[in-house]
Amino acid sequence: MQFSVEIQASKEEVWDTLWQDETLREWADIIDPGTHLVGELKEGNKVQFLSGNGYGVTTLVEKLTPNEFLLFRHQADTQGNGEQKRKAEWTGGKESYTLTEGDGVTTLTAAFDVPPEQEEYFAANYPKALERVKELAER
């Protein structure tokens, strides 16, 4: 799946909106309530995206170019107790965020692998999350 949104803000402002804890929680909440990031976004690091109920995904920061590109490769589903299930629906999937800027407008493109049974949910909710990123970055 892939979605894009044009934002009247610099790449740096959009990047900060995506990945600073306070604003990440605001836009990611639309996808899965209470979602937050645990760990440091640094190439080669593993981080976790956990929802309010403690479930989520452990992912590898495979490629990171600040203010331009971030690629995650999902390693394992994470259960409420922190246990990781290696063979689960998100394992092996990719998720990327690309920012391109021109004439004061940044285009944010999010692309990701989604289990077939969740495609409808993400198609309905991810554009709303990106619109929230836009609102936050433009304020």
Label each residue range with its predicted role.
Residues 1-36:
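Hydrophobic ligand-binding cavity/cleft-lining segments
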Residues 88-91, 113-139:
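A conserved amphipathic terminal alpha-helix motif
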Residues 52-103, 113:
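Hydrophobic-ligand binding "helix-grip"
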Residues 14-18, 24, 47, 61, ...:
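Hydrophobic pocket/interface hotspot
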Residues 7-12, 62-69, 98-107, 135-139:
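A short, structured loop/turn motif at beta-sheet edges
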Residues 7-9, 51, 112-114:
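Short beta-strand-to-loop capping motifs
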Residues 1-6, 46, 56, 69, ...:
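Intrinsic-disorder/low-complexity, polar/charged segments enriched in Ser/Thr/Lys/Arg/Asp/Glu/Gln
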Residues 41-47:
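Short coil-to-beta transition motif at edge beta-strands of beta-rich domains
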